[in-house]
Design a protein with these regions (language model features):
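Conserved thiamine diphosphate
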Residues: 1-36
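Glycine/aspartate-rich loop-and-adjacent alpha/beta segment that forms the canonical ThDP
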Residues: 29-158
């Protein structure tokens, strides 16, 4: 469920979706949420290392990858910024905010939801012996892209 987007559709609610790997974004979100003169919701990504099959020392890396892959886009919805969603919704902090997927310039590697899924043991059953993703995983990637494109549209980026 897209809890942040659901909350943002309620009138006069400050909403942030952030991660511990993006400290400045998280700090800003927490400070603004506490200062907001109404209800605030701050959703912070946290991997469950044993259940997700992620090493104990990789929590920050995984949180960054969740954002980079569009699995968990960062956003801030601040009703004080204006009367329209475009004015209130801020996607700053996400990489390549105008693009569908983030591409690492040095390696030309595209980071997408499949990249994220490959990094977590819980998705291992969705890859065949040749490392090809299952139809379900490809559908999840398509859904993540649709969600990202909707956020871009709401924020007036596309």
């Amino acid at each position: 469920k897209e809890l942040a987007q659901i909350c943002a559709m309620h009138p006069n609610v400050y909403v942030a979706q952030t991660t511990c790997a993006h400290f400045n974004h998280m700090y800003r979100a927490m400070m603004e949420a506490m200062e907001f003169p109404g209800p605030s919701v701050v959703i912070v990504y946290s991997t469950c290392q044993p259940e997700h099959g992620v090493a104990d020392n990789m929590a920050m890396h995984q949180a960054k990858l969740a954002v980079d892959s569009r699995a968990f886009p960062m956003m801030i919805h601040d009703p004080r910024k204006g009367n329209t969603i475009k004015e209130r919704l801020d996607l700053k902090g996400n990489p390549s905010v105008k693009d569908d997927w983030y591409t690492i310039r040095k390696t030309d590697e595209t980071i997408n939801f499949i990249t994220f899924a490959r990094s977590e043991g819980r998705f291992a059953k969705h890859f065949d012996e040749d490392d090809n993703p299952s139809p379900e995983l490809l559908a999840s990637q398509h859904e993540r892209l649709r969600n990202w494109n909707m956020l871009q549209e709401l924020a007036g980026i596309i």
